[in-house]
């Protein structure tokens, strides 16, 4: 029991800064929305539309680079720290190449925006302008993620938290300058949010690099002198590990976007109630997601040390802590769902629907916690392909079709509206949780030599 308590303390010490960093990131999006809304409703809508396209694109790159964390954690655990710098440099090369692709996609996103049904031309122009300003921040964001993954792979999660709050503090005044046109800058409205956010990502990257160069604990990890050339073998391995994570993230984000589109014809009340419940459940999701990042670090580190039993302990402890957290957040959600809905909207119909949907959200919080922490465990074992297959099957083969049938058809019951999609979420997330646990159990039952051989690849 003592080893589980000790492991839980270590996991929470790693997870809490990640939680706070995620809160800072969420707050940046909130600030952009509020400040753009203060300028005009059209600008706020433009930022929302632009963000809905930016997120899937940038999260694809983000997921690709998540491969660095278990790689660095295992090199650190095995005492091969001299190899970390080369992995990080190749991570920067990979981030640079992916940035170019993302920037090309975002530059041409106007075709998608202008093809939206009944979209106002002025709104479309502002959304395109916002994206074309924001896309210059894509390299800064991905370079920052490489540096952050280096720190987190070495079990240092506080720097990412600090840089997140630096970004938030810089974002507010820079937004103000470019939205309203102060200090000689042009008045850009919502487009100014894109300029500010792009600048903030570069500030966060430069601040993180400055920290890494000065950190005593990383003095033995220095990038190669001169300009290291791309190493095809290392980059190929990072892509093999990261691409399934990137695709899983992409399909998860697009799932919720598709559901939002399917709900939109049902009416204002249904859309508002769905959005409130989804926004709140996304806030609760920060807890298990941050714990999953910590579990990846601990499992990778233990496997690097050559201890499969300690890796199992880290995995099981992460799951136990996650289930405890999810139970508490589910009780909180059920108990205060109406009061929470009132914070967003005071329309009685909207509040009633949102409260009902939050009840369904509380049901899936434990499944959601298990599946996301399970994903973190599998990343620690470098078993990333299974993450993609599981999430795609659970969300797109089981969850979304089930939700569609329940919400919009009478094949099983009378059309349930948004609640049908939320039952689909429950089916999808529960299926993912079961499959993640089965895969973890399969891996942990392999002979130690095979587990360590797979992890060392």
Swiss-Prot record:
GO terms for cellular component: plasma membrane. The chain crosses the membrane at residues 11-31, 53-73, 93-113, 127-147, 160-180, 189-209, 243-263, 276-296, 314-334, 350-370, 387-407, 418-438. Pfam families: MatE (PF01554). It is a multi-pass membrane protein. One of its GO terms (molecular function) is antiporter activity. Its main location: membrane. One of its GO terms (biological process) is sodium ion transport. It is found in: Cell inner membrane. It comes from the Bacteria. Keywords: Antiport, Cell inner membrane, Cell membrane, Ion transport, Membrane, Sodium, Sodium transport, Transmembrane, Transmembrane helix, Transport. InterPro entries: MATE_fam, MATE_MdtK, MdtK-like, Multidrug-R_MdtK. Belongs to the multi antimicrobial extrusion (MATE) (TC 2.A.66.1) family. MdtK subfamily. NCBIfam families: matE. Multidrug efflux pump that functions probably as a Na(+)/drug antiporter. This is Multidrug resistance protein MdtK. It comes from Escherichia coli (strain SMS-3-5 / SECEC). The lineage of its organism: Bacteria, Pseudomonadati, Pseudomonadota, Gammaproteobacteria, Enterobacterales.
């Amino acid at each position: 029991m003592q080893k589980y308590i000790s492991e839980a303390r270590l996991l929470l010490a790693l997870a809490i800064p990640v939680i706070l960093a995620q809160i800072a990131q969420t707050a940046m999006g909130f600030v952009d929305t509020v400040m753009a809304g203060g300028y005009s409703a059209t600008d706020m809508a433009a930022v929302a539309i632009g963000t809905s396209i930016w997120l899937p694109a940038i999260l694809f790159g983000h997921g690709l680079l998540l491969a660095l964390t278990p790689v660095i954690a295992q090199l650190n655990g095995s005492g091969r720290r001299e190899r970390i710098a080369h992995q990080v440099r190749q991570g920067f090369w990979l981030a640079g190449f992916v940035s170019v692709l993302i920037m090309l996609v975002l530059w041409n996103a106007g075709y998608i925006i202008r093809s939206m049904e009944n979209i106002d031309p002025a709104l479309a122009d502002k959304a395109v302008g916002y994206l074309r300003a924001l896309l210059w921040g894509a390299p800064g964001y991905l370079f920052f993620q490489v540096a952050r993954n280096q720190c987190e792979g070495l079990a240092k999660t506080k720097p990412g938290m600090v840089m997140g709050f630096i970004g938030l503090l810089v974002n507010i005044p820079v937004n103000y300058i470019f939205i309203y046109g102060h200090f000689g800058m042009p008045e850009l409205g919502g487009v100014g949010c894109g300029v500010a956010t792009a600048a903030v990502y570069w500030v966060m990257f430069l601040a993180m690099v400055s920290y890494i160069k000065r950190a005593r604990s990383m003095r033995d990890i220095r990038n190669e002198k001169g300009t290291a050339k791309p190493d095809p073998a290392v980059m190929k391995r990072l892509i093999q590990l990261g691409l399934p994570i990137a695709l899983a993230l992409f399909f998860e984000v697009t799932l919720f976007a598709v559901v939002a589109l399917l709900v939109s014809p049902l009416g204002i009340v249904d859309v508002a109630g769905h959005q409130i419940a989804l926004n709140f459940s996304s806030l609760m999701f920060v807890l298990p997601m941050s714990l999953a990042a910590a579990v990846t670090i601990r499992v990778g580190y233990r496997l690097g040390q050559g201890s499969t039993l300690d890796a199992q302990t880290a995995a099981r402890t992460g799951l136990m802590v996650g289930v405890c957290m999810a139970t508490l957040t589910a009780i909180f959600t059920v108990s205060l769902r109406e009061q929470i809905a009132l914070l967003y909207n005071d329309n009685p119909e909207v509040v009633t629907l949102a409260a009902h949907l939050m009840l369904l959200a509380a049901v899936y919080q434990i499944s959601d916690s298990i599946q996301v922490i399970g994903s973190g465990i599998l990343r620690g074992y470098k078993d990333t392909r299974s993450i993609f297959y599981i999430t795609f099957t659970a969300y797109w083969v089981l969850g979304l079709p089930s939700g569609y049938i329940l919400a919009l058809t009478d094949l099983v019951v009378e059309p349930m509206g948004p609640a049908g999609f939320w039952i689909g979420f429950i089916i999808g997330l529960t299926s993912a949780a079961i499959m993640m646990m089965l895969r973890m159990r399969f891996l942990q039952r392999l002979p130690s030599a095979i587990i360590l051989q797979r992890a060392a690849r």
